Curated annotation (Swiss-Prot):
Organism: Mus musculus
InterPro entries: Papain-like_cys_pep_sf, Pept_asp_AS, Pept_his_AS, Peptidase_C1A, Peptidase_C1A_C, Peptidase_C1A_papain-like, Prot_inhib_I29
Keywords, comma-separated and alphabetical: Disulfide bond, Glycoprotein, Secreted, Signal
GO CC annotations, alphabetized: cell junction; extracellular region
Annotated family: Belongs to the peptidase C1 family.
Protein name, as recorded: Testin-2
Classification lineage: Eukaryota, Metazoa, Chordata, Craniata, Vertebrata
Superkingdom of origin: Eukaryota
Length: 333
C-alpha cells in the first residue's frame, strides 16, 4: 500500500508519459541499482531512473560549485537516489512536535566556561550509528541516543537501547508507528513505564507491533527531562556539561538528503520548520578557529553509508541554522 501511494506521488512530480533518459548514465545507474539492491517493475523503473538522473545531475552541479568555492560541503549519491525530496522527507524524517507538560529548563547562566571542542564519542558516550530504515522514527533514535549517553554517565556502561520498544508501546495517542513522534514523549514513557528495554532484547524492526516489553530486560530509567532554551549558546553549554543532546532540525532539502562531508550550510533551511530528530554529540572547528568554520557534530540515524559515516557537521553560530537549538532536550536519569 505504501509503495503504491509513493508511486502515485512520483507520477505527479514527474511527467510520467515518457521520461527522457540519458543513455550515457547507463553504467552508473546499473552500478547504483546493484549496490543498493534495487528492483522495480517495468513501469516504475523508468520513473525511478528519471528521479535518479535528476538527483545525480543536481549532485554533480553542486560539487562543481563546491570546487569553485560556492559551498562548504560536498554531496554524494546514496541509497536515497531514486526518491524525490517529497518522498524522502515523508519516509526518512519523523519529528512531530506535540503537547507536553511543563518541564525543567536548563540553567545555562550557571556555566561560564565551556571548551572550544567537544566530542562525546571519544569518551564512550555514543553507541554506533543506527538505521531507522524507511520509517519516520527519527524521534525514537534521538531519544535513545541521549538516554544511552546519560546512562553511561551514571553507570559507566554503554548499552544500546530499544527504539522498537518506544514504537510498539507508547500508544496511538502519542505516536503512530512510522508517522513521527516527539523525544520528550519518549522520555515521559520511559519514566512512566519504569524502564526501557535493551536493543539486544527488543531489536528494531520498524512499523509498530504489539508491545513486548519485559521489565527484566530494562537497561535505562528516566526521572525527568530538561528543555534547553532555544539559543545556540545554551545548547553549547548543555552539550559541554551534560553530554549528547536530542534536537530537531529542518532536513527538508536535497542538500541534506545527499550530504557527504564538510560543514552543512543550506540557505533555505528554516529555524522553525523542524521535521527530523537527531543527536548533537559535540561541536568544534574545521581548521583554525575563525568565523564561518564552526560546526555542531550531529549523529543521524540513516546508517553509516550516509554522510560522514552516519554523521553530519551542521553550521554553528549561524543564527540557529536549521533550527538546531530550537527544541533541544535531554533526560535526567
Amino acid at each position: 500500500m505504501i509503495a503504491v501511494l509513493f508511486l502515485a506521488i512520483l507520477c505527479l512530480e514527474i511527467d510520467s508519459t515518457a521520461p527522457t533518459l540519458d543513455p550515457s548514465l547507463d553504467v552508473q545507474w546499473n552500478e547504483w541499482r546493484t549496490k543498493h539492491g534495487k528492483a522495480y517493475n517495468v513501469n516504475e523503473e523508468r520513473l525511478r531512473r528519471a528521479v535518479w538522473e535528476k538527483n545525480f545531475k543536481m549532485i554533480e552541479l553542486h560539487n562543481w560549485e563546491y570546487l569553485e568555492g560556492k559551498h562548504d560541503f560536498t554531496m554524494t549519491m546514496n541509497a536515497f537516489g531514486d526518491l524525490t525530496n517529497t518522498e524522502f522527507v515523508k519516509m526518512m524524517t519523523g519529528f512531530r512536535r506535540q503537547k507536553i507538560k511543563r518541564m525543567h529548563v536548563f540553567q545555562d547562566h550557571q556555566f561560564l566556561y565551556v571548551p572550544k571542542y567537544v566530542d562525546w564519542r571519544m569518551l564512550g558516550y555514543v553507541t554506533p550509528v543506527k538505521n531507522q530504515g524507511y520509517c519516520a522514527s527519527s524521534w525514537a533514535f534521538s531519544a535513545t541516543g541521549s538516554l544511552e549517553g546519560q546512562m553511561f554517565k551514571k553507570t559507566g556502561r554503554l548499552v544500546p537501547l530499544s527504539e522498537q520498544n518506544l514504537l510498539d508501546c507508547m500508544g496511538s495517542n502519542v505516536t503512530h508507528d512510522c508517522s513521527g513522534g516527539f523525544m520528550q514523549n519518549a522520555f515521559q514513557y520511559v519514566k512512566d513505564n519504569g524502564g526501557l528495554a535493551t536493543e539486544e532484547s527488543y531489536p528494531y524492526i520498524g512499523p509498530g507491533r504489539k508491545c513486548r516489553y519485559h521489565a527484566e530486560n530494562s537497561a535505562a530509567n528516566v526521572r525527568d527531562f530538561v528543555q534547553i532554551p532555544g539559543r545556540e549558546e545554551a545548547l553549547m553549554k548543555a552539550v559541554a556539561k551534560v553530554g549528547p543532546i536530542s534536537v530537531a532540525v529542518d532536513a527538508s532539502h536535497d542538500s541534506f538528503q545527499f550530504y557527504d562531508s564538510g560543514i552543512y550550510y543550506e540557505p533555505q533551511c528554516k529555524r522553525v520548520h523542524l521535521n527530523h530528530a537527531v543527536l548533537v554529540v559535540g561541536y568544534g572547528f574545521e581548521g583554525e578557529e575563525s568565523d564561518g568554520n564552526s560546526y555542531w557534530l550531529v549523529k543521524n540515524s540513516w546508517g553509516e553509508e550516509w554522510g560522514m559515516k552516519g554523521y553530519i557537521k551542521i553550521a554553528k553560530d549561524w543564527n540557529n541554522h536549521c533550527g538546531i537549538a530550537t527544541l533541544a532536550t535531554y533526560p535526567i536519569v
